[in-house]
Amino acid sequence: MKILVIGGTGFIGPPVVGELQRLGHRVAVFHRGKSTASLPPDIEHIIGDRQQIAEAQQNFEAFAPDVVVDMILSSGPQAEALMHAFHGVTRRIVAISSIDVYRACGVTHGIEPGPLEPLPLTEESALSNYNKSSGFIGGV
């Protein structure tokens, strides 16, 4: 399969990219080109900014991924831009989320009110107010 990984140069990305390649997939990574991440030498690179993802649409079409794995999706507007950028390009998008969807992240960073959440966080933990109000969670 041809798999495009968005944000594959961070903490989790390189092991994911390496494992996908080890399993025999052709992998491309969409990133800003600013990371010194250790990626396998024959990985394809599509350089661009996540905030202007539509600008790379021709490159996405040229790679023609069977699956897109988004490692850095963090908001409703980003999800909408992702869906538009890949409409007609791929039939499958996998969104990898993070602790940012939970209220605990906002409380810890001082941007959401409330007490600290008990650990460990689970899928039953309270969601961030932004993600609840934007319809991002459960709406994509």
Across the structure, where does each feature detected by a protein language model lie?
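NAD(P)H-binding glycine-rich loop region in Rossmannoid oxidoreductase-like domains
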Residues: 35-95, 101-108
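N-terminal Rossmann NAD(P)H-binding glycine-rich loop of SDR-like oxidoreductase domains
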Residues: 3-25
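Conserved Rossmann-fold NAD(P)-dependent oxidoreductase catalytic core, especially the SDR/UDP-sugar
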Residues: 80-140
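Cofactor-binding loop segments of dinucleotide-utilizing enzymes, especially the Rossmann-like FAD-
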Residues: 8, 32, 98
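Conserved beta-strand positions in the Rossmann-like core of class I SAM-dependent methyltransferases
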Residues: 28
